[in-house]
Amino acid sequence: MTTLIYDSTFEGLLTAVFEVFEYKYDAVEIIAKENYTQENFFAETHEVITDFEKSDRVLKKLEENLGKEGISQLMLVYFSERKDLERLILSAVRHSINHPKQNILKDFGNDDMLEISKICRSV
């Protein structure tokens, strides 16, 4: 398990998502710096430095796959301040990359997409 620690900004989160793909991390957890506590001494940690070029690339790919409405929904998840917001956003990006022609945020058969939908309706 690799833990990516980012600076709590949306751009930092998108940079972390980029680095998941860049370094081909499979078992990964993304955590904001202020929420990080080292629970697993054997886990590898990687501190993410916010890179606006990387975050812009992720944003452009998301806009291509999900449109502006999809990005707005992911922003709502980010602003929800849930403990699992990073996992949900990473799951949405992975799902979007794997199914680029599909509106993955309407894929309610996927538990994470259903949870994102619930968050967006509650706001």
Model regions: which residues?
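N-terminal ordered "arm"
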Residues: 1-51
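Charged, alpha-helical interface segments at or near domain boundaries
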Residues: 40, 45-123
